[in-house]
Amino acid sequence: MNTIGPHGEGAFEKRHVGEEEFLLVLDELVAALRANGAPFAFIGGIASAVMGRPRPTLDMDVMVRPWEAGAVLRALGDAGFETQETFPHWLFKAARRDVVADVIFLSTGDIHLDDEMLARVLRRAFMGRMLPIVAPEDLLVMKALAHSEETPRYWYDGLSLVARSDLDWDYLLRRARHGPRCVLSFLLFARTAGLVVPAGAVRSLRRLVATGRLAA
């Protein structure tokens, strides 16, 4: 296992690689994760490409349970990846042949791969491979909460999820408890873009923001 301390450079810098190389490393990543046995699901650019809008991505974002992140990183190291405990409270990295995988175990709003999210994980095709992908509702909430000046693409990824996915609005509202103000702001933004957002969902989020309870 080749582990590097926090904030190391070199192998963990994101670089443009060819599609063939990217997919080869993806296959190796998935094989190592499946051999380890801990549940995982893809988020980030791969999930957005599957369920929303295709866009270029330089890395792979995979979510694991917080208490299994260390074992997952060790398994990737044993499989030949260079590994890094980048931010020990939420993010590790693994790299191979100039392709970086972000191993995320805590997202903005204290979102983690809990039982509710795991129960909704989907198997979807990506570039000829069947991968576990988080549900579009979970991805949308994560995109809404992680939006910043440096990552405006996250909300545009979210717009594509509203436009292209048949969302379970009741489930989305339950997951919105991690950041109801951000999710409400995003859904109002989606309306300005001409997308259909149920009025009941907006009312429920306004109530959640105001009172801490969802509308009946």
Sequence positions of predicted segments:
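Compositionally biased terminal segments of proteins
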Residues: 1-216
